[in-house]
């Protein structure tokens, strides 16, 4: 049964399309008549949060987006950053949260497919993927099913397409029970002088449809992604798209081959709102109109209506504006790769978006008002109150420090993620230098003997909830720090801002404050935001997720032979901590997982110290003086030392004698701007003298060697015991053995 194009427009139909009464009135004022059913669908798709950023645009404009290496900032399919020698890195992160909750395998798979398309649409060959995943509490009845489906979906698509997954995050919290997060990142490499944009240029040029055929999957997907969930969630399953990574691989090769011919004027992938969004964006950006003839669109289902074709989110599709004389050559390339190639319209000079189906004009709308002049809101917001200070002396010390550390490394959130990343192909393409499990993934740049890129994705949602401003700063700082810990120079970042319902002032306040914090940190660290995505309405039955502004960054290693890892220390090396003694236990995992409390403020991020300490650590690594390096984050110094010992298989003998403060704060405090370095014994004094000269605080902590982590008389844990505890939680959880392994 198809939907006829003449369907009465009722208040229920308008509300069902996610349009508020005042927005519908704006449509009437704009076009001077009642919209057709297809036009209503087009407005609904273009004016929802997912496509228009109407609640967030005002604040996103405040982010720093320029820098000496930035070739293309936000507004295109992905950001583009110069990496020298005529090369650039193209990258972006994007959410596929709502679809992944409804249909975890396909939701996650098409999230990966969509972000890869964003990268190769720009003319770049994808070289790395990451994903940041948040699930509900481990003992929630749906969590295991969702983890299994999402991880299979991410792996199934990425592995088949042929891109290595080099990093990411997996976290559990009850606040994601009804609304998981799947944030997918991809990066590719292109020539700086061969970047392809989505802005159409020239009148009367062919608009070409490329790739897979159009079906009914995903109709209304963008609208679904702009609404809160409720009990009717099962009914939304048809709005999840279905992906085919092999078609996408062919699409990648065909696009890159066609781009070499000079035929491509503009190109846009079909993502949210499919044909509607890609056509409107290409025309509106180039100040051109677009005429589409739907009878020419390749379809895989019969009797599809204009409404369905315009809003389908079938995967593996592109829209392109071509040089007319290259039409035959272009068609031959796509046919060779077994893909559809159809001229479905042309550019016009009237700034109208016109759609014709079966001889009938089913839409005729002002293209600018759909695209870059969509509604924009300045929503009311209020700052959230900050938790009271929590001095370390008010926090109980553990009865047994070794037990407390085992509990942390074997907990749901600090345990090894090996079960997850072993399902991903981390080595395909043969350029992976650092795999998941360290501070950042590192990938060699093909064709260069020494150059590599480092990638990391970070956010600490519990900090953001306690203090959105400091939490926003911390997400950026930790990403920058993880990249720095490999020896790379952080170049730029992409953001994926996941929040609840922006119509609630307290949620909008979280968003505004987090964006302000992100902006301040990016400016202080010269780490511009070049692309990104906002996902709002992440709520179920009125319960919002933890505010989760994920930051993914890229760094450049001019010489990867000097790169640092977390597990490459040698026997006899000296252990040095860079940064201040641990003192901050508010919002720490020690507080949460050992003492079962979520009190206290988030740690403050001193951006001057962050930069000074990070620049110093990078110089030590680049001077070939560091044998290993690890940043200190969740779990504090104790967890960082345990992770280094487990990664290297070598023990550590630690003496806190130089440190000032209570032992539980020194070991489990989550103060920022800190690293652990191991250096050969004969350069330890030299490194410390240089630190002093640079005004960088440091502590000599001890020596590498033996088969246990020993901290004064507080902790003595054999590495094997640490590893067994660290590695067992995830497999035990997925196989349903014991409720929580470490408890």
Curated annotation (Swiss-Prot):
Per the record, the domain of life is: Bacteria
Residue numbers binding Mg(2+) 2 = 118, 269
| Entry binding sites for ATP | 53, 92, 495, 532
Please name the Pfam families in this protein's record.
AIRS, AIRS_C, FGAR-AT_linker
Q: Where does the record say this protein resides?
A: Cytoplasm
What Enzyme Commission number(s) appear in the record? 6.3.5.3
Where is Mg(2+) 1 bound in this sequence? 94, 533
Locate the residues binding substrate: 95-98, 117, 241, 313-315, 535
State which residue ranges cross the membrane: none
Question: HAMAP family from the entry?
Answer: PurL_2
The record's listing under NCBIfam families reads: FGAM_synth_II, PRK01213.1
Q: Could you give the subunit structure recorded for this chain?
A: Monomer. Part of the FGAM synthase complex composed of 1 PurL, 1 PurQ and 2 PurS subunits.
The protein depicted here goes by the name: Phosphoribosylformylglycinamidine synthase subunit PurL
Gene name on record?
purL
């Amino acid at each position: 049964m198809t939907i006829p194009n003449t369907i009465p427009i009722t208040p229920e139909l308008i509300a069902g399309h996610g349009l508020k009464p005042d927005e519908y009135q704006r449509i009437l004022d704009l076009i001077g008549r009642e919209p057709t059913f297809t036009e209503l669908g087009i407005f609904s798709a273009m004016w929802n949060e997912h496509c228009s950023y109407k609640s967030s645009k005002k604040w996103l404009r405040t982010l720093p987006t320029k820098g000496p290496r930035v070739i293309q900032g936000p507004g295109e399919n992905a950001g583009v950053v110069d990496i020298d020698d005529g090369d650039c890195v193209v990258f972006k992160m994007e959410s596929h949260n709502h679809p992944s909750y409804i249909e975890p395998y396909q939701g996650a798979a098409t999230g990966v497919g969509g972000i890869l398309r964003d990268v190769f649409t720009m003319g770049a060959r994808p070289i790395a993927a990451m994903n940041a995943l948040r699930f509900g509490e481990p003992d929630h009845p749906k969590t295991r099913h969702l983890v299994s489906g999402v991880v299979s979906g991410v792996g199934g698509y990425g592995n088949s397409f042929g891109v290595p997954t080099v990093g990411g995050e997996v976290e559990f919290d009850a606040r994601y029970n009804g609304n998981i997060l799947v944030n997918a990142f991809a990066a590719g490499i292109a020539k700086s002088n061969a970047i392809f944009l989505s802005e159409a240029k020239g009148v009367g040029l062919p608009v070409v449809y490329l790739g897979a055929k159009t079906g009914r999957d995903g109709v209304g997907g963008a609208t679904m992604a702009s609404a809160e969930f409720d009990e009717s969630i099962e009914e939304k399953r048809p709005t999840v798209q279905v992906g085919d990574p092999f078609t996408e691989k062919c699409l990648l090769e065909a696009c890159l081959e066609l781009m070499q011919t000079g035929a491509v004027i503009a190109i846009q992938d079909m993502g949210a709102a499919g044909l509607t969004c890609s056509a409107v964006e290409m025309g509106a950006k180039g100040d051109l109109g677009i005429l589409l003839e739907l009878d020419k669109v390749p379809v895989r289902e019969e009797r599809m209506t204009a409404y369905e074709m315009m809003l389908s989110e079938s995967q593996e599709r592109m829209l392109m504006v071509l040089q007319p004389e290259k039409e035959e050559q272009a068609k031959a390339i796509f046919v060779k790769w077994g893909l559809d190639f159809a001229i479905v319209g042309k550019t016009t000079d009237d700034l109208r978006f016109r759609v014709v189906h079966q001889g009938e004009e089913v839409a005729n709308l002002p293209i600018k008002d759909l695209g870059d002049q969509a509604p924009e809101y300045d929503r009311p917001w209020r700052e959230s109150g900050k938790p009271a200070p929590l001095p370390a002396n008010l926090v109980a010390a553990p009865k047994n420090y070794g037990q407390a550390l085992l509990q942390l490394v074997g907990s749901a959130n600090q345990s090894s993620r090996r079960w997850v990343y072993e399902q991903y192909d981390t080595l395909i393409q043969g350029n992976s230098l650092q795999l998941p499990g360290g501070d950042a993934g590192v990938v060699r740049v093909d064709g260069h003997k020494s150059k590599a890129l480092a990638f990391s994705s970070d956010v600490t949602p519990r900090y953001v909830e306690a203090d959105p401003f400091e939490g926003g700063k911390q997400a950026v700082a930790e990403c920058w720090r993880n990249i720095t810990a490999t020896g790379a120079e952080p170049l730029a970042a992409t953001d994926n801002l996941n929040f609840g319902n922006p119509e609630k002032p307290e949620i909008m306040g979280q968003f505004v404050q987090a964006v302000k914090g992100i902006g301040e940190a990016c400016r202080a660290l010269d780490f511009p935001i070049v692309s990104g995505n906002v996902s709002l309405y992440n709520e179920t039955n009125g319960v919002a997720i933890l505010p989760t502004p994920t930051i993914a960054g890229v760094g450049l290693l001019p010489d990867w032979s000097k790169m640092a890892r977390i597990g490459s220390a040698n026997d006899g090396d000296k252990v040095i901590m860079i940064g201040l003694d641990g003192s901050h236990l508010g919002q720490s995992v020690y507080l949460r997982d050992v003492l079962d409390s979520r009190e206290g403020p988030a740690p403050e991020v001193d951006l001057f110290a962050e930069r000074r300490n990070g620049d110093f650590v990078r110089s030590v690594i680049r001077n070939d003086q560091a044998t290993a390096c690890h940043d200190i984050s969740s779990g504090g110094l104790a967890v960082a030392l345990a992770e280094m010992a487990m990664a290297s298989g070598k023990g550590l003998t630690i003496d806190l004698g130089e440190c000032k403060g209570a032992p539980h704060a020194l070991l489990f405090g989550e103060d920022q701007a800190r690293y652990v370095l191991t250096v050969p014994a004969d350069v330890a004094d030299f490194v410390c003298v240089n630190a002093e000269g640079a005004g960088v605080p440091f502590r000599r902590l001890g020596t590498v060697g033996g088969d246990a982590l020993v901290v004064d008389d507080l902790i003595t844990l054999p590495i094997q015991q640490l590893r067994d505890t660290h590695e067992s939680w995830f497999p035990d959880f997925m196989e349903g053995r014991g409720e929580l392994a470490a408890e």
